[in-house]
């Protein structure tokens, strides 16, 4: 069972916390991690690309010249694909790129990402994280006391407006609640700070 240090907001270690082996201590599955990341990135694509085919381009209803007798190749429309300004053949059309993975696969990917962070000493657990007012300098002080100076993902048990507002002006810092934790965010950030209550919620869902 993985055991990590427990810190307070001033950066002092106040104890240790045991993490669920089935969530934070598994052997990471890189193939499943890859599948989950690709799925998430695909779901984020807009898919609004569009071009006009020959039926959608304005004009071209009249035959440009008669069928026979001109010596030129026969043409039926000035909007045929071979004409300048004509329609596009097999061009992109609006579509949804998103797809789904099985629930077991998604959960395994999330466990793999969390276990990787623990194994690399990139996961910090806070006793609690709350501010009386949404002050950026307070969040900066917390990160500084924990010696976090790179991209960091902060996971709280539930949405806290003061914490969210205090961190939004800090580059490379993102706040999610325990229900919104995902593989892409975990992989994209160098450090992950999780509150003790958030750990309990994550273990409740994934264990």
Curated annotation (Swiss-Prot):
One of its GO terms (molecular function) is rRNA binding. InterPro entries: Ribosomal_uL4 (IPR002136), Ribosomal_uL4-like (IPR013005), Ribosomal_uL4_dom_sf (IPR023574). It comes from the Bacteria. Residues 60-71 have a biased composition (Basic residues). GO terms for biological process: translation. Residues 44-78 are annotated as: Disordered. GO terms for cellular component: ribonucleoprotein complex; ribosome. The keyword rRNA-binding applies. Part of the 50S ribosomal subunit. One of the primary rRNA binding proteins, this protein initially binds near the 5'-end of the 23S rRNA. It is important during the early stages of 50S assembly. It makes multiple contacts with different domains of the 23S rRNA in the assembled 50S subunit and ribosome. HAMAP family: Ribosomal_uL4_B. This is Large ribosomal subunit protein uL4. It comes from Brevibacillus brevis (strain 47 / JCM 6285 / NBRC 100599).
């Amino acid at each position: 069972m993985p055991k990590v240090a427990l810190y307070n907001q001033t950066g002092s270690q106040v104890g240790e916390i045991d993490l669920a082996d089935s969530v934070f201590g598994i052997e990471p599955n890189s193939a499943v991690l890859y599948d989950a990341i690709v799925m998430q990135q695909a779901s984020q694509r807009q898919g609004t690309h569009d071009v006009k085919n020959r039926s959608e381009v304005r004009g071209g209803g009249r035959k440009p010249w008669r069928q026979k007798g001109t010596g030129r190749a026969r043409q039926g429309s000035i909007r045929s694909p071979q004409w300048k300004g004509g329609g596009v053949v097999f061009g992109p059309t609006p579509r949804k790129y998103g797809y789904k993975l099985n629930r077991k696969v998604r959960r395994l990917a999330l466990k793999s990402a969390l276990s990787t962070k623990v194994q690399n000493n990139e996961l910090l657990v806070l006793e609690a994280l709350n501010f009386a007012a949404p002050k950026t300098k307070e969040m900066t002080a917390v990160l500084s006391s924990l010696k976090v100076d790179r991209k960091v993902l902060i996971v709280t048990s539930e949405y806290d407006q003061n914490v969210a507002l205090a961190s939004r002006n800090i580059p490379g810092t993102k706040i999610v609640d325990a229900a919104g934790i995902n593989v892409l965010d975990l992989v994209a950030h160098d450090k992950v700070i999780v509150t003790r209550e958030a750990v309990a919620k994550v273990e409740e869902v994934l264990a």
